[in-house]
């Protein structure tokens, strides 16, 4: 009556040489997603995933650790060159970029894709402290 041990399907190694690193640096966290040219995710990581909680998630060091983690996972799939797209005003922008270089990727281009409104929505009322 004992059940057979379940076979765990091993994740197949994608053999991709070039990818795009999307660095989303908000005021509270930094998220790094490495995709192929079509936008299919290869690896991802964030400061919160790496064990940083609260205000420590928004530090440059947390962004560096998250970028190293995402980079190592992507390198296992054969990624060697990266285009980097940086979005957001956070403090982890530059440190995440340096960490991706330190992992050993050849960075071909760096683009800032931060969305800038053409005077979007009305701001909330002024704070009175």
From Swiss-Prot:
A Gene Ontology molecular function term of the record: structural constituent of ribosome
Protein's GO biological process: translation
A GO cellular component annotation in the UniProt record: ribosome
Thylakoid recorded as keyword: no
Keywords in alphabetical order: Ribonucleoprotein, Ribosomal protein, RNA-binding, rRNA-binding
Record InterPro entries: Ribosomal_uS11, Ribosomal_uS11_bac-type, Ribosomal_uS11_CS, Ribosomal_uS11_sf
Transcription found in the keyword field: no
Domain of life: Bacteria
Pfam families attached to this UniProt entry: Ribosomal_S11 (PF00411)
Subunit (UniProt): Part of the 30S ribosomal subunit. Interacts with proteins S7 and S18. Binds to IF-3.
Database matches in NCBIfam families: PRK05309.1, uS11_bact
Family of the protein in this entry: Belongs to the universal ribosomal protein uS11 family.
Functional note: Located on the platform of the 30S subunit, it bridges several disparate RNA helices of the 16S rRNA. Forms part of the Shine-Dalgarno cleft in the 70S ribosome.
Protein name (Swiss-Prot/TrEMBL): Small ribosomal subunit protein uS11
Gene it is expressed from: rpsK
């Amino acid at each position: 009556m004992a059940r057979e041990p379940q076979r765990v399907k091993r994740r197949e190694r994608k053999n991709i040489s070039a990818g795009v690193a999307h660095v989303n640096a908000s005021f509270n966290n930094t998220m790094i997603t490495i995709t192929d040219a079509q936008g299919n995710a290869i690896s991802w990581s964030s400061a919160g995933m790496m064990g940083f909680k609260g205000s420590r998630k928004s530090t440059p060091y947390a962004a560096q650790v998250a970028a190293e983690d995402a980079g190592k996972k992507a390198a296992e799939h054969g990624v060697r060159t990266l285009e980097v797209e940086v979005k957001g005003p956070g403090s982890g922008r530059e440190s995440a970029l340096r960490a991706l270089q330190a992992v050993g990727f050849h960075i071909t281009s760096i683009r800032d894709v931060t969305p800038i409104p053409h005077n979007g929505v009305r701001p909330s009322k002024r704070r009175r402290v």
